[in-house]
Amino acid sequence: NLIYRNGKKEDGLNDAGLWFLRSVNYDLWQEHPEVMLIAEDSSDYPKVTAPVVYGGLGFDYKWDLGWMHDTLDYLATPFGERSAMTNRFLFSMSYFYQNNHLLPLSHDEVVHGKKTIIDKLWGNYEQKFAQLRCLYLYLFFHPGKKLSFMGNELAEFLEWSEQREPGWNLLSYPAHQKFHQFLQKLHKLYLEFPCLWEQDYDSRYFRWLHMGPSIFVIQRSDYQQNSLIAAINLSDKDAQCTLELDCGLVSILDTLDPEEKNVCDVTVKSKYPYSDKITLSLTVPALSGVVLKPSELQKKNIKKKIS
């Protein structure tokens, strides 16, 4: 470990190692500013992604290994025990803005008997796929750049090996094909809405609207105050939550199989007198998520209907 002597925090800082990192990163930044410098670092050493001139190590991004472990451990936990892990699931945002974090679902997690991403998840075959779609929706709505290792988009059940190519034949199976198609829609959504990436590292543009224990609701915004909301139900039962907003909401993407009869439902409960605030009741089916877009048209209709 270049940060601590003998790789142990209690042994003190490795001054020579820190000098080396700062020198190399500064020179690379000067000569090749187009190159991304990314640290795979599990320590809590500060300012890993701060510029060298400000006392940092000069990396552009740092792997958020805490987010990865907490999220995957949560999804590997039986449904009935997840409420006790809510704080751990939410913990990543308590330190996220200390560095420019990158969210990794990397090669490290799909080798050496660790199982693939989908195989780590609790539940039966159908529940694993449902949660995998929820996981990627959460990944794309959580602040931070994204890293997903090849084969993850196929929902591989076989661990990665350098001796064979990814299992492209999996796309001939309906569940894998539907997951792959969902990811395509999610990528398209990500590119279409700057609020999902424009202000990753500014806390003013992220907000928890509901923090579990069943439904987690995230709002992402951009400079122009355009926003999207993701509501994700990680329990095995349909769940409901209440949101207080100044507009209506319309669904533009969900993780549900088109053949399923369940739907995500948004209904108006009340409107505050002398206020633009609207109380919305949001019902999300078990192990599913929905992307919601503010709707000015719906807002006008709601006001007319309630007044």
Where in the sequence are the language-model features?
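Carbohydrate-interacting/catalytic domains
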Residues: 126-129, 140-148, 152-307
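Short, flexible loop/turn elements at secondary-structure junctions
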Residues: 41-43, 107-109, 222, 286-288
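Active-site-proximal helices and loops of the catalytic beta/alpha 8
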Residues: 1-102, 138, 155-188, 198-200, ...
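Hydrophobic targeting/anchoring helices
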Residues: 134-140
